[in-house]
Amino acid sequence: MTRILHRQIHGTLPVAVGGKGVEIFDAQGKAYIDASGGAAVSCLGHGHPDVTAAIHAQADKLAYAHTSFFTTEAAETLADRLIEDAPKGMSHVYFVSGGSEAVEAALKMARQYFVEIGQSERRNVIARRQSYHGNTLGALATGGNEWRRTQFKPLLIETHHIDPCFAYRYQMPGESDEAYAARAAQELENKILELGPETVIAFVAETVVGATAGAVPPVADYFKRIRAICDRYGVLLILDEVMCGMGRTGTLHACEQDGISPDIMTIAKGLGGGYQPIGAVLLGQHIYDAFAKGTGFFQHGHTYLGHPIACAAALAVQGVIRRDGLLTNVQSMGARLRQRLGDRFGNHPHVGDIRGRGLFMGVELVEDRSTKATFDPKKKLHARIKREAMARGLMVYPMGGTIDGVRGDHVLLAPPFIVDEAIVDTIVERLGDAVDAALESVRSNVA
């Protein structure tokens, strides 16, 4: 009997006892290829000696120092590294313990920025439907995942949502990417004008949409148009790269591929690679200057901000990525993953879309390719795929509610940056078998 309140109360999980490279091992000795990086976290895989050595060394030196009393070498060095590699205009870093905390801090930072510069009437946040920004209340309110939000709506602050930039589901037949980008971005301007530009704090978006919709990249020029609209009305652009950032898409920051810089950016998962809980908010010089010239104080904080062991781990992770040229591997293995997925599923009668960037790929399942009709949500196809994949020693990240929080199924893939061709091929082979087995169980009406 477990004393843990697990995510799923019914059922028994295997006990993980070890990990090495791209594999996790359970107590029965079974190996699982971690093709999802957990939740797009384990960018270096498991048991990397450089990272564990850095953790050990920092623990021997200093395990904890509260940020109201001290800064630390580990935090200062990591901040320098992050800004050195940051998008243009980013000047400072605020450390937290994970993605939801990062989004909460970013929201408060954006609000306080306008208070500091004398625009305290700004109170509205705009985000996108079918987005996910975290499970704490502010982040949950900002996200557009209805399944996650529904029972907690009475507790959520008012936020406003527009449609996502989701070509497979929203681009009209015959509509060019340029026309679709313009139409999708126009929704933001319309919403700003509806609310009143003087009342809007920020627009929040995942650069590449993650778990909720399954690695959905924007069409070309969408974010350039979004950036221009935000600038036109003095609205801050907050990019959430908690899942898609820190190398996952083949560049350190996903927005590099869209040719823009945000005002504020959140990062987490790939920052520490799962070796320690850590996230961060990157902020532009203008945000910092408003605080510095105003109250000189950011009214926010948590006990474990800038935790030295977490910062040391993240610094080691980022050092390995840079030293070993792993972004190049993400690009080349990402191309192979896309090719192999196309080979296996390109003509599959129940795969509607294969999408993503780098080692961040989504496969959307449909009942009918021609109409894009989804499977009955009651069939829980995504859960069946996960079960079949685990049985085959493969960890993937399937989700339901791809379209509206209820309908749709997809599988998210986010393997470690260290994968090679053989591992990529094995991932796709096992996934193909798992998908076919799950579909057969649906057809056979097996529970």
Show the residue positions of the predicted features.
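Conserved N-terminal phosphate-binding loop of PLP-dependent enzymes in the Aspartate aminotransferase
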Residues: 1-447
